[in-house]
């Protein structure tokens, strides 16, 4: 038989997978060997093919004669022998391990096992490791998910995990013939969070979808534009840059004509908007930012000339006596703007300039005409929300809690809304807030434009200030209780690109110099290998210093947890670093710090990134609706759950690892919320939080913060990042590392500017004309 003449014939081959010789992460192409030493090759879409070594597999494909490697079997599909049911039992049904599934399928045929699970599950109690509690979990999970079998069988060969299969099934629950719909247009899977264009495209191309199909290009446009905005913070994109990104994603060389046709179609469908000549925005961001412009324009036309207090100076003198503080000229101006009838104010100030004091004075003034209960303060994070409440004395909520509580109403039932930490708020969230604020509600926006911009798309605070969309009061004077308190002064020097007086002795700031002697001479005078060794040794010294400082906070952290003051324990001490990778990156520091702060030997859950233990400090890393309970309901053992939005950046504590249910339970004390994470969701939704990136700490405040600084992180060194990191510390800021790297970061002013819909629309229309 001539092997090369059989290219249109399909064969089947089975055997035990002996060894994986090669696997390309990018193309998913692999070369492997069966136990009979037969070589096989093809694309396998599960990136963990090594996990099925030793398993019996069934291949469908064709024999080829490779010039270099000889006769091989090139497979089109690769499935475990018990593919359908084995996959379903191990990936979907809770309580059944891989070993248990193998034993069950060894004793029973598929039909027999399905019959037992449906009608006689108690028979499984005869198997080792399956007791009453586990059997209950297995049966409940089987009944809930048995209709997923067909979908699981179809998607398993593409490496789609059980968690995603469940999400797909739930999302498309009303769709008939779902598998056929996916085969026709696999890009509908992009609707599922976590399945990007690349994964959907792999499935599509393996199913024979035309590379130039309209829905392939349209799906890529939508996804690429959304990802570009989310990842870069821009809410619009230049046409030529957009086309370049599409070329990369689709594998085309200048596919401009294809893009032009698809883009016109999507603009006509209002899926993408033209913001200005040759700039485009996704529909949601265009809508949100356009509405923000309209909101402030409408409010500007409704300003009243009626004063709240006619004799303002006399009132202010009285208030300063009763409240026990005096206002500066700038702070007085802020209060006076509201007194003179403005319904909107941007109160902008850098660290230590008295934004909280000014906010309190403004709210006290407004309480002359509204009741205490008519005033609400809000912030993105629970910690920031608590802080504004503590400093002003007025009620506060997280933005999401306020939105959820009043989602059925047209407007918030408050006459005054104060938004704090506004630099953190992206376009969509800002729109959600203003869409609930009526024209006669006073809206005060408080923020620090020296900090990093919001996570997510948009640059609302910056744009509103740039185009004066409402009255602005800028606070510039820094307040210090005494000369030994320097955090605010040092931070503001850095913000201006100046090297501060960092070597002085302060009660709230300390620089630990762990430098390579004569750094620049060593760099220029030694070969690369020797200098790299010097850098490595110095990095280890920095790490040792960090761990020594961190160890001084262990006992107090333990005490706070023991006293059940979890919120305080989570914010007592925080290490903040610019990058994820490397010895002084988030991932390694989290591992090292976990050894210090959590020496528990109880059973833990290992994932690709971390080993999660009871009482670990963790952070939620992606906005997601999660299964949750109030702390009271959880303590009472309630079986009732609610779906609640958990935001990127929320700090929590692991209070239970349930190995029967495969669930990690996390307490978020600032939100009085307990959240349940399936084990297979941990790396995508959760992370250890002993160390965080600077971006993750936006809007947060910690009693004590430690920041490593080294030339290893040079790419991330700039004044905005360092300013943001230092201003996270309330009582003490430790900076540990290389002196020259610190001085370099202090002088490297961030020049990157975000592109936005607001800027596109208003740059030539300063007066809304």
Regions found by a protein language model. Give the residues of each.
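ASCE P-loop NTPase helicase motor core
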Residues: 332-510
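OB-fold nucleic-acid-binding modules
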Residues: 1-9
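Short glycine-/polar-rich loops that comprise or flank the Walker A/P-loop
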Residues: 373, 414, 439-442, 468-473, ...
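Conserved helicase motor core of P-loop NTPases
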Residues: 333-337, 342, 355, 362, ...
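Conserved nucleotide-binding/hydrolysis modules and their immediate coupling elements
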Residues: 13-21, 25-64, 426, 591-723, ...
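Accessory alpha-helical DNA-binding modules that contact the DNA backbone or grooves
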Residues: 8, 29-33, 41, 52-57, ...
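Helicase C-terminal subdomain and adjacent C-terminal extension
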Residues: 1, 704, 710-769
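Pre-P-loop entry segment of helicase/translocase ATPase cores
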Residues: 156, 218, 222, 226-231, ...
């Amino acid at each position: 038989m001539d092997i090369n003449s059989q290219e249109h014939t399909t064969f089947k081959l089975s055997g035990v997978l002996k060894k994986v010789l090669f696997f390309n992460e990018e193309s998913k192409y692999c070369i492997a060997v069966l136990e009979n030493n037969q070589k096989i090759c093809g694309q396998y879409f599960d990136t963990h093919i090594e996990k099925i070594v030793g398993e019996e597999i069934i291949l469908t494909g064709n024999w080829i004669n490779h010039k270099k490697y000889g006769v091989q079997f090139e497979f089109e599909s690769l499935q475990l022998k018990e593919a359908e049911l084995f996959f379903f039992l191990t990936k979907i049904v809770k309580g059944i391990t891989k070993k248990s599934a193998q034993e069950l399928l060894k004793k029973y045929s598929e039909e027999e096992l399905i019959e037992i699970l449906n009608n006689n599950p108690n028979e499984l109690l005869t198997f080792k490791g399956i007791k009453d509690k586990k059997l209950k979990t297995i049966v409940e999970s089987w009944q809930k998910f048995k209709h997923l079998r067909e979908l699981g069988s179809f998607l398993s060969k593409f490496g789609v995990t059980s968690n995603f299969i469940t999400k797909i099934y739930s999302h498309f629950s009303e769709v008939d013939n779902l598998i056929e719909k996916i085969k026709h247009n696999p890009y509908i899977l992009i609707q599922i969070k976590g399945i990007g264009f690349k994964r959907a495209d792999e499935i599509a191309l393996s199913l024979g979808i035309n590379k130039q199909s309209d829905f392939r290009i349209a799906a890529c446009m939508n996804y690429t534009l959304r990802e570009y905005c989310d990842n870069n913070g821009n809410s619009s994109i230049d046409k030529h840059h957009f086309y370049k990104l599409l070329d990369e994603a689709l594998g085309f060389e200048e596919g401009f004509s294809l893009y032009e046709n698809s883009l016109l179609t999507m603009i006509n469908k209002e899926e993408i908007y033209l913001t200005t000549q040759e700039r485009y925005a996704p529909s949601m961001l265009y809508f949100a930012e356009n509405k923000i412009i309209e909101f402030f324009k409408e409010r500007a036309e409704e300003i009243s000339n009626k004063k709240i207090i006619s004799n303002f100076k006399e009132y202010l003198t009285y208030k300063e006596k009763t409240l026990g503080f005096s206002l500066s000229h700038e702070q007085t101006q802020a209060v006076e703007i509201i007194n003179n009838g403005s319904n909107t104010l941007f109160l902008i100030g850098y660290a230590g300039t008295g934004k909280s004091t000014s906010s309190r004075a403004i709210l006290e003034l407004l309480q002359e005409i509204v009741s205490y209960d008519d005033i609400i303060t809000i912030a993105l994070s629970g910690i920031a929300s608590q802080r504004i409440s503590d400093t002003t004395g007025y009620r506060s909520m997280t933005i999401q809690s306020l939105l959820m509580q009043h989602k059925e109403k047209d407007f918030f039932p408050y006459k005054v809304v104060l938004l704090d930490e506004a630099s953190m708020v992206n376009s969509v969230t800002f729109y959600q807030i203003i869409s609930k604020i009526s024209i006669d509600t006073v809206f005060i926006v408080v923020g620090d434009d020296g900090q990093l911009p919001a996570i997510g798309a948009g640059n609302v605070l910056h744009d509103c200030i740039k185009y004066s969309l409402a009255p602005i009061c800028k606070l510039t004077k820094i307040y210090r209780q005494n000369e030994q308190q320097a955090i605010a002064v040092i931070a503001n020097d850095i913000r201006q690109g100046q090297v501060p007086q960092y070597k002085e002795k302060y009660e709230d700031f300390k620089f630990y110099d762990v430098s390579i002697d004569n750094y620049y001479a060593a760099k220029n005078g030694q070969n690369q290998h020797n200098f790299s060794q010097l850098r490595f040794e110095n990095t280890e010294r920095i790490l040792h210093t960090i761990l020594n400082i961190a160890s001084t906070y262990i006992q107090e952290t333990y005490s706070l947890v023991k006293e059940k003051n979890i919120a305080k324990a989570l914010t007592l001490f925080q290490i903040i670093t610019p990058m994820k990778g490397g010895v002084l990156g988030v991932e390694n520091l989290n591992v090292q710090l976990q050894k210090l702060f959590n020496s528990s030997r109880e059973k833990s859950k290992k994932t690709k990134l971390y080993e999660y233990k009871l009482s670990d400090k963790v952070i939620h890393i992606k906005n997601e609706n999660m299964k949750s309970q109030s702390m009271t309901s959880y303590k009472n053992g309630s079986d009732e759950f609610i779906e609640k939005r958990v935001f990127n950046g929320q700090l929590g504590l692991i209070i239970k690892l349930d190995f029967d249910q495969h669930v990690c339970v996390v307490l978020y004390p600032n939100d009085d919320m307990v959240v349940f994470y399936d084990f297979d969701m941990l790396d995508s939704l959760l992370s250890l939080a002993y160390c965080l990136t600077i971006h993750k700490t936006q809007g947060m405040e910690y009693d004590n913060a430690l920041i490593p600084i080294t030339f290893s992180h040079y790419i991330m060194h700039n004044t905005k990042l360092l300013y943001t990191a230092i201003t996270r510390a309330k009582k003490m800021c430790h900076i540990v590392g290389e002196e020259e790297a610190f001085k370099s970061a202090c002088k490297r002013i961030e020049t990157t500017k975000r592109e936005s819909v607001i800027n596109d629309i208003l740059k030539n229309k300063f007066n809304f004309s």
